[in-house]
């Protein structure tokens, strides 16, 4: 009994919890996620089945298989630089606030409140837009599945109205909010299931679809055919190619979820960065396989994009449907394959709400949101329950813009990519400028390459911000104008105005809750 009989038991905190306390926060959420669970949430939000399937038309229209095959690796490589820089910062600051907390720490005392404010609002609005976009895409996919199941566009199939689609969207969000009200241990299991579903789904579809197809593209076609027949008045090869990159960049986003889940992840200073990097890396590999497999079933691009085909112009749905119909005389197998994708999209939306709610919880914990005390409330299951339902409600309201104008909805959805990547870039640029000599890395460090990778990441975000703002059709009219710059400028104007007239007087950046 060498230490004496009055020794009391002292619980051992893991490295992530120790670091959280050093940063000024007490543990309020249940820390129960493994490194695989952390990865699974980001991987499920990236969800190559979701992003590629729902935006395949864009890649096919702008450059075809060449843009899809080569553009995916180009966008993926630069996105990995963004992810590596984020992972390094995450290792040093593993909190649910993620990006906005990083900005505050890296900007220094003078600029911390403003940097934190702008990063936080771009991040959370971008996340809400992602959820709105994903669940609306699922509602549209369900509509296409119903259309094909009832005979297709040319066989008297049922196509729901815009109000039906928005109703489905609302129902999906309601289910996602219910699921996210469950304990984190349950969400961890569902997240792991979602990751496995995405992995297996990609493997099955990338092999099955070209195998079943009676007409296959040649390898030369897949790797060299450049489609310029976009019907949108754009003829420049370079311009067409960069517009086609939008599919890839839209897909590989949302991996900041691993950072937002760090307060619920064991050894978060190590496993948070691993979650970010592995989610991006595995998504790049599996996404390319999915693109390649599907592209071997592409033989007539104009027909796939035509709104007069059975799926109403939904290219991948038409590919799946025709593959089975031409082989077996029935497109039922193709509809089942679309069901596999739909489940992946469902998981993607669910994980998006999980990430949204943790960001809202952390941002309100620091007093940045209206009615902050309400949104950072944690229930008996250690779940930020009010933030969950807030995220679902706002995402639903965002999708309501589709009833007024699809152009307005597309502008809002564009914030899902641009808003998030601007939020990604702010802490990185602070890391390589103001904090270049003061930043102290955590267990994961890029070492001497940190500055180079950081600058590459920043330049890539600037590049894609320009690309997403380019006109996508000529001549430019009110219907064809790309309203992305307007949407982003509007968000900047609102957040800066809020700051100048109100928040600068009371928002000081992240607030310690150790003593509360």
Curated annotation (Swiss-Prot):
Tissue expression: Expressed in roots, rosette leaves, stems, cauline leaves, flowers and siliques.
Major localisation: mitochondrion
Transmembrane segments: 33-53, 70-90, 113-133, 164-184, 189-209, 232-252, 275-295, 328-348, 383-403, 406-426, 452-472, 483-503
GO MF: gamma-aminobutyric acid transmembrane transporter activity; L-alanine transmembrane transporter activity; L-glutamate transmembrane transporter activity; L-lysine transmembrane transporter activity
Gene deletion effect: No visible phenotype under normal growth conditions, but mutant plants grown on medium without sucrose show strong decrease in root growth and plants grown on soil under low light intensity have reduced rosette leaf expansion.
Role noted for this protein: May play a role in primary carbon metabolism and plant growth, by mediating the transport of GABA from the cytosol to mitochondria. When expressed in a heterologous system (yeast), imports Arg and Ala across the plasma membrane and exports Lys and Glu, but does not transport proline.
Name of the protein described by the UniProt record: Amino-acid permease BAT1
Record organism: Arabidopsis thaliana
Gene designation per UniProt: BAT1
């Amino acid at each position: 009994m060498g230490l004496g009989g009055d020794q009391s038991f002292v619980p051992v905190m893991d490295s992530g919890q120790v670091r959280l306390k050093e940063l000024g926060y007490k543990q309020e959420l249940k820390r129960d996620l493994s490194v695989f669970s952390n990865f699974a949430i980001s991987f499920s939000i990236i969800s190559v089945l979701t992003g590629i399937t729902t935006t395949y038309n864009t890649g096919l229209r702008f450059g075809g298989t060449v843009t899809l095959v080569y553009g995916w690796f180009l966008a993926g490589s630069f996105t990995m630089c963004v992810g590596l820089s984020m992972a390094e910062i995450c290792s040093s600051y593993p909190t649910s606030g993620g990006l906005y907390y990083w900005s505050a720490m890296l900007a220094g005392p003078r600029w911390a409140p403003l940097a934190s404010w702008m990063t936080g609002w771009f991040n959370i609005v971008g996340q809400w837009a992602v959820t709105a976009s994903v669940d609306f895409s699922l509602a549209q996919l369900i509509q296409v599945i119903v259309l094909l199941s009832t005979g297709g566009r040319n066989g008297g199939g049922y196509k729901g109205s815009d109000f039906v689609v928005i109703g489905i969207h609302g129902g999906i969000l309601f289910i996602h909010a219910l699921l996210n009200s469950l304990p984190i241990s349950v969400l961890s299991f569902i997240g792991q299931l979602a990751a496995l579903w995405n992995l297996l789904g990609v493997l099955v579809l990338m092999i099955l679809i070209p195998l079943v197809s009676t007409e296959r593209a040649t390898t030369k076609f897949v790797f060299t055919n450049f489609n310029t027949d976009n019907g949108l008045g754009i003829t420049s090869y370079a311009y067409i190619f960069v517009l086609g990159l939008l599919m890839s960049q839209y897909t590989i986003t949302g991996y900041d979820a691993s950072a937002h889940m760090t307060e619920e992840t064991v050894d978060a200073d190590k496993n948070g960065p691993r979650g970010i990097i592995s989610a991006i890396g595995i998504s790049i590999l599996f996404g390319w396989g999915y693109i390649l497999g599907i592209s071997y079933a592409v033989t007539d691009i104009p027909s796939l994009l035509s709104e007069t085909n059975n799926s109403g112009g939904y290219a991948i749905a038409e590919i799946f449907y025709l593959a089975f119909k031409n082989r077996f005389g029935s497109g039922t197998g193709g509809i089942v394959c679309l069901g596999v994708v739909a489940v992946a999209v469902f998981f993607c939306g669910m994980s998006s709400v999980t990430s949204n709610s943790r960001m809202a919880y952390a941002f309100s914990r620091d007093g940045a949101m209206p009615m902050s005390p309400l949104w950072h409330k944690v229930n008996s299951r250690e779940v930020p329950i009010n933030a969950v339902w807030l995220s679902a409600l706002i995402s639903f309201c965002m999708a309501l813009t589709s009833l007024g104008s699809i152009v307005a909805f597309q502008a809002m959805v564009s914030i899902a990519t641009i808003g998030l990547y601007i939020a990604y870039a702010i802490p990185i640029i602070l890391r390589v400028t103001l904090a270049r000599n003061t930043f102290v890395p955590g267990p994961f460090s890029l070492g001497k390459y940190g500055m180079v990778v950081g600058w590459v990441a920043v330049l890539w975000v600037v590049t894609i911000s320009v690309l997403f703002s380019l006109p996508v059709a000529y001549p430019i009219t009110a219907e064809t104008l790309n309203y992305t710059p307007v949407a982003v400028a509007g968000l900047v104007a609102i957040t800066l105005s809020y700051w100048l007239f109100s928040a600068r007087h009371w928002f000081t950046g992240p607030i310690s809750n150790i003593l509360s």
